[in-house]
């Protein structure tokens, strides 16, 4: 059973709310860098950056982080049974910058732990904050987001799916019951 919990109109409001929270909690945004975790985190980062530019007239660099080699629970393997790497693309040096790490759903915290390891291999940021579109709870690691679009409590036998226009041809968030 699939249940829509956020439609496209509400999703736009969520992006605006996260953007305002980022503006309010940062004295200046000149040292900000948004880093999206592949795949949907990148699209979310780009949308927040676009909204920030509309509201404040400031362009924030947006980077892409591939955490494949840093995961402790899974790897995408290619035909040679090796991890499938897609590469990082961060347009600026993150050293001494305030990096806002962005992902779609925060669940156990393992993805974020892997992303923190990957980021630290790329430089030494002044500060790292975490923004997520959805916090569904059930943490296994002591990780807490700084910016949350929606808190959507779930059961362990449920899954949150985020649809993004860029790859899914529509926006929305659904909860699906697993078998």
UniProtKB/Swiss-Prot annotation:
EC code: 2.4.2.9
Q: Which InterPro entries is this protein grouped with? A: PRibTrfase_dom, PRTase-like, PyrR, PyrR_bifunctional
Q: Which SUPFAM superfamilies match?
A: PRTase-like
Which EC class does it fall in? transferase
Motif PRPP-binding: which ranges? 99-111
Q: Which domain of life is it from?
A: Bacteria
State whether keyword Cell inner membrane applies: no
Q: A Pfam family for this UniProt protein?
A: Pribosyltran
One molecular function GO term is: uracil phosphoribosyltransferase activity
The UniProt keyword set, sorted, is:
Glycosyltransferase, RNA-binding, Transcription, Transcription regulation, Transcription termination, Transferase
Q: Which GO terms describe its biological process?
A: DNA-templated transcription termination
Q: Which family does it belong to?
A: Belongs to the purine/pyrimidine phosphoribosyltransferase family. PyrR subfamily.
- Spell out the NCBIfam families in the cross-references: PRK05205.1-1, PRK05205.1-4, PRK05205.1-5
Q: What does this protein do?
A: Regulates transcriptional attenuation of the pyrimidine nucleotide (pyr) operon by binding in a uridine-dependent manner to specific sites on pyr mRNA. This disrupts an antiterminator hairpin in the RNA and favors formation of a downstream transcription terminator, leading to a reduced expression of downstream genes.
HAMAP family in UniProt: PyrR
- Which proteins does it associate with, and in what oligomeric form? Homodimer and homohexamer; in equilibrium.
Q: What is the protein's name according to its record?
A: Bifunctional protein PyrR
Species annotation? Latilactobacillus sakei subsp. sakei (strain 23K)
């Amino acid at each position: 059973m699939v249940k829509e919990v956020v439609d496209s109109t509400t999703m736009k409001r969520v992006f605006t709310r996260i953007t305002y929270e980022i503006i309010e909690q940062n004295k200046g945004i000149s040292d900000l860098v948004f880093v999206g975790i592949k795949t949907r985190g990148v699209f979310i980062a780009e949308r927040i950056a676009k909204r920030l530019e509309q509201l404040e007239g400031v362009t924030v660099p947006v980077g892409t982080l591939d955490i494949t080699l840093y995961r402790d629970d899974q790897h995408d393997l290619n035909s040679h049974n090796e991890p499938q790497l897609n590469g990082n693309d961060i347009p600026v040096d993150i050293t001494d910058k305030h990096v806002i790490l962005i992902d779609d759903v925060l669940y156990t915290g393992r993805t974020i732990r892997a992303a923190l390891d990957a980021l630290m291999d790329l430089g030494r940021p002044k500060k790292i904050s975490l923004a997520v579109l959805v916090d569904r709870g059930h943490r296994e690691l002591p990780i807490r987001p700084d910016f949350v679009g929606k808190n959507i409590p779930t059961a362990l036998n449920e899954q949150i799916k985020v649809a993004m226009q860029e790859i899914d041809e529509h926006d929305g968030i659904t909860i699906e019951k697993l078998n």
